[in-house]
A protein has these predicted regions:
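Sec-dependent N-terminal signal peptides
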Residues: 4-13
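C-terminal segment of classical bacterial N-terminal signal peptides
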Residues: 14-18
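Start-of-domain marker
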Residues: 19-77
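Single-residue signature of alpha-solenoid repeat helices
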Residues: 37, 102-105, 158
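Alpha-solenoid helical repeat scaffolds
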Residues: 42, 107-110, 160-166
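Short coil/linker segments at helix-helix boundaries
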Residues: 64-153, 169-176
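Extended alpha-solenoid helical-repeat scaffolds
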Residues: 156-162, 177
């Protein structure tokens, strides 16, 4: 009887040990802004349990960066709509922040896709973020806009965005496009 109880206790103990996310991943998923999450990912990347957790962490970075992108693009759209209606759209757009967020979202999305397509701890590839590929691919157009925005202002940044656009055409993550 003692052996059965001991075996059941060991089974419960091992199943709970492997059931949830690691502590570093939980901290990354709780982060409320991109800078905080990026620092956590950078400092704890080697502590994440496997490729699935790394993909989850980079997906969280992508989501946080896209909040800024969507917010600023919403303001741009609202300003354009106001102009078309004959009113003055005068809400300020943080273009520098927008394109920084575009770059961060693109890079985080590519990393999430990369880790998502790597074998898990069992040696099997089970992509969970397949829908992310199309969303990240669409950000390539914003890389061009970022390069154009920085032309004449900051040549290094302009080159960075335009070069990223050109180089990303050959990324294996985007082979289906």
């Amino acid at each position: 009887m003692k052996k059965i109880i001991l075996a059941v206790m060991m089974l419960i103990g091992t199943s709970t040990a492997f059931a949830g996310d690691s502590e570093p991943l939980k901290a990354i998923l709780k982060a409320q802004n991109y800078a905080e999450a990026a620092n956590l990912v950078q400092s704890t990347l080697d502590q994440l349990a496997g490729n699935e957790e790394k993909a989850k962490a980079y997906n969280r970075l992508y989501e946080l960066a896209m909040k800024k992108v969507n917010y600023e693009e919403g303001i741009q759209l609202e300003n354009e709509t106001q102009k078309q209606m004959g009113k003055e759209g005068n809400k300020p757009v943080d273009e520098k922040g927008l394109y920084a967020a575009v770059g961060a979202a693109f890079n985080s999305g590519v990393e999430a896709i990369k880790y998502d397509n790597m074998p898990n701890q069992k040696g099997k590839v089970k992509p969970k973020y397949a829908a992310l590929v199309e969303s990240v691919y669409k950000l390539r157009n914003d890389l061009i806009n970022g390069g154009v925005y920085y032309q004449g202002k900051d040549d290094k940044m302009a080159y960075k965005y335009l070069a990223e656009y050109v180089e990303s055409a050959g990324y294996p993550e985007f082979a289906s496009f």
